[in-house]
């Protein structure tokens, strides 16, 4: 009789151990990132911002991969975001110059023209050796030393705006130079540059992925308003992203305020193709 009681007690003890381990497993999973991808250029971790640091950092930790403006964060904050497994990509605008940057006065003479719909930006001459050197050896080094996991480079669309050979070669030189930091590179937009790179068999030697905005949505900058993309543009982008995928590039989408029905369509499209996407609330990317 005592032997049976002992066996029953051991059985319940084992059940309790299993239950405890399962509970611990669920708790651990709950703390790991739950969402795939987010672009948060409007979020800062600095003390002078209105939202408490911890609240912002916790929001970013909920993602497996985030794109941030590095100057909005300290290296310590980037380490904290990464602590639970989040990958942090640093934004770097290589094809345009913003008037709020501390180096604006140094390079404004090398700008080419105002950037439509973005009053604070100007297209840059990427063939300029001083601009190339600054991006590669100053900003590139600074951002990589902060502990980012990759670069998110904006405005290679300069090659669409100015389709000269020196612009194309200038972009290639910048990308080649940034490779010295051994970090993956994602290009935001730049489909004209990307497609030529693919055709010449150079894409994977220069960058690792592409992010395309507004495949399924579009922005009316006059309001602003967030709308569904027209069929022709959507078809063009889908064909372009298919080429990028076939070339071995990773593919990301950033959409703006897609409603629940459209979000389901985008989610299905991305699952079928192995893409990641982010549904931004607004242009502020917060």
Where do the protein language model's features map onto the residues?
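Intrinsically disordered, low-complexity segments enriched in Ser/Pro/Gly/Ala and basic residues
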Residues: 8, 22-24, 31
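Bacterial N-terminal signal peptides
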Residues: 12-23
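Compositionally biased regions
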Residues: 10, 24-26, 145
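Short, low-complexity interaction segments enriched in Ser/Thr/Pro/Gly
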Residues: 1-2, 26
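Bacterial N-terminal signal peptides that target proteins for export
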Residues: 2-13
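Glycan-processing catalytic domains of CAZymes
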Residues: 28-286
């Amino acid at each position: 009789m005592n032997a049976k009681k002992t066996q029953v007690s051991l059985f319940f003890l084992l059940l309790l151990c299993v239950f405890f381990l399962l509970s611990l497993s669920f708790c651990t999973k709950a703390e790991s990132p739950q969402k795939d991808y987010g672009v948060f250029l409007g979020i800062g971790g600095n003390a002078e911002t209105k939202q408490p640091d911890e609240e912002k950092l916790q929001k970013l930790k909920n993602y497996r991969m985030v794109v941030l403006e590095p100057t909005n964060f300290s290296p310590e904050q980037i380490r904290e975001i990464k602590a639970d497994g989040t990958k942090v990509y640093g934004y770097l605008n290589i094809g345009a110059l913003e008037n709020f940057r501390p180096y604006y006065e140094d390079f404004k003479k090398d700008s080419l023209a105002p950037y439509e719909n973005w009053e604070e930006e100007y297209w840059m001459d990427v063939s300029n050796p001083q601009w190339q050197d600054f991006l590669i050896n100053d900003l590139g080094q600074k951002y990589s030393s902060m502990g980012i996991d990759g670069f998110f480079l904006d405005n290679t669309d300069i090659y669409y705006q100015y389709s000269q050979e020196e612009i194309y070669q200038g972009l290639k030189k910048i990308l080649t130079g940034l490779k010295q930091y051994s970090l993956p590179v994602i290009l935001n937009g730049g489909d004209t540059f990307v497609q030529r790179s693919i055709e010449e068999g150079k894409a994977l030697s220069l960058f690792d992925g592409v992010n395309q905005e507004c495949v399924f949505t579009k922005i009316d900058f006059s309001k602003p308003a967030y709308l569904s993309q027209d069929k022709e543009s959507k078809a063009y982008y889908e064909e372009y992203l298919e080429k990028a995928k076939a070339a071995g590039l990773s593919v990301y989408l950033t959409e703006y305020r897609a409603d629940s029905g459209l979000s389901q369509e985008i989610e299905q499209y991305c699952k079928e193709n192995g893409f990641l996407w982010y549904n931004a609330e607004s242009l502020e990317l917060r």
